Amino acid sequence: MNPRRKKRLTLAVALVFGLGATIGLMLYALSQNMDLFYTPTELVQGKPDGTKPEVGQRLRIGGMVVEGSVKRDPQSLIVTFEVADVGPAVTITYNGILPDLFREGQGIVAQGVLVNSTTIEAHEVLAKHDEEYMPPEIAEAMKKTHEPLQYSDEQKQGRVQ
């Protein structure tokens, strides 16, 4: 093989290797930043296709805060509460200041890590905007079960107990 062809071959191999490494790193970064959305029922029972998240997986969960479930640690900012849709409840632990619109009986979306099959350690909690707002993922999940949410008059008025 003459030197000119050898140089071209080396350059082509280096280019293909570099391009492959770049694409591999991009796919790895995207997979690390992907958070899958679950409802409490899907988290406990699994999605219709049979998939369930693994312990340690990052995810988003949305539902309604169960009334009487909010417990605050008086010594720190740690808050523990339960979120449910139409099925089982999931416990969420959050260390931080909750949004002003957060209250029992209202919709939230939490982003965090699955600690065990029914507990999530959240690093972000988002509250809904008003008494009629529901995140699209939660509304779609509720439609699938054909069970509409029943709001109390106090929830519709936005009063805190």
Curated annotation (Swiss-Prot):
Residues involved in heme binding: 129, 133
SUPFAM superfamilies: Heme chaperone CcmE (SSF82093)
Keyword Transmembrane: yes
Cleaved signal peptide residues: none
Alphabetic keyword roster: Cell inner membrane, Cell membrane, Cytochrome c-type biogenesis, Heme, Iron, Membrane, Metal-binding, Signal-anchor, Transmembrane, Transmembrane helix
Periplasmic side: 30-161
InterPro entries documented for this protein: CcmE (IPR004329), CcmE-like_sf (IPR036127), NA-bd_OB-fold (IPR012340)
Molecular-function GO terms, alphabetical: heme binding; metal ion binding
Regions of this protein lying in the Cytoplasmic compartment: 1-8
GO biological process: cytochrome complex assembly
Example of a GO cellular component annotation carried by this entry: plasma membrane
Subcellular location: Cell inner membrane
Membrane-spanning residues: 9-29
Gene3D superfamilies membership: Nucleic acid-binding proteins
Pfam family, one: CcmE
Membrane topology classification: Single-pass type II membrane protein
Similarity comment: family membership: Belongs to the CcmE/CycJ family.
NCBIfam families referenced in this protein's UniProt entry, alphabetically: PRK13165.1 (NF009638), PRK13254.1-1 (NF009727), PRK13254.1-3 (NF009729), PRK13254.1-5 (NF009731)
Function in brief: Heme chaperone required for the biogenesis of c-type cytochromes. Transiently binds heme delivered by CcmC and transfers the heme to apo-cytochromes in a process facilitated by CcmF and CcmH.
Name listed for the protein in its UniProt record: Cytochrome c-type biogenesis protein CcmE
Lineage: Bacteria, Pseudomonadati, Pseudomonadota, Gammaproteobacteria, Vibrionales
